[in-house]
Amino acid sequence: MNNSLKKEERVEEDNGKSDGNRGKPSTEVVRTVTEEEVDEFFKILRRVHVATRTVAKVNGGVAEGELPSKKRKRSQNLGLRNSLDCNGVRDGEFDEINRVGLQGLGLDLNCKPEPDSVSLSL
């Protein structure tokens, strides 16, 4: 019972902390945030939201506030494309050029380009 009284006294001396600074006042530094920092944070947050919405629209044409579903991402990774080409133009509809050779292939920036694999017919 005498041990429990010592523990209670020790907790009161440490102010609830047992970090080895018994009986010493705590030296916590409390940093206040300025209005400018708060404004800057929210500006950055808005930019991230705008960028996310823009990427979501470009990648799948989804409604605002929704990101592409896992199923859509999976189908895009497998090469199952929708009717829109990467640049938003339907395949050969507006520019009247039939593209042969690159449809269904992913773009790999690490490989060297092969100019013979692309053929345009007018």
Swiss-Prot record:
* Protein's cellular compartments: Nucleus
Chain segments annotated as coiled-coil in the UniProt record? none
Segments carrying the region annotation (Disordered) are 1-28
Task: Report motif location: Nuclear localization signal.
Answer: 70-74
Q: Name a single GO biological process.
A: regulation of systemic acquired resistance
Which cysteines are disulphide-bonded? none
Key words of the record = Nucleus
Segments of this protein annotated with the region Involved in NPR1/NIM1 interaction: 39-45
Q: Which InterPro entries match?
A: NIMIN-2
Induction line: By salicylic acid (SA) and BTH.
Feature: compositional bias, Basic and acidic residues: 1-22
Q: Name one GO cellular component term.
A: nucleus
Chief location of this protein within or outside the cell: nucleus
Complex formation: Interacts with NPR1 N-terminal region.
Protein name from the UniProt record: Protein NIM1-INTERACTING 2
> What is the species of this protein?
Arabidopsis thaliana
| Lineage of origin | Eukaryota, Viridiplantae, Streptophyta, Embryophyta, Tracheophyta
Q: Which gene encodes it?
A: NIMIN-2
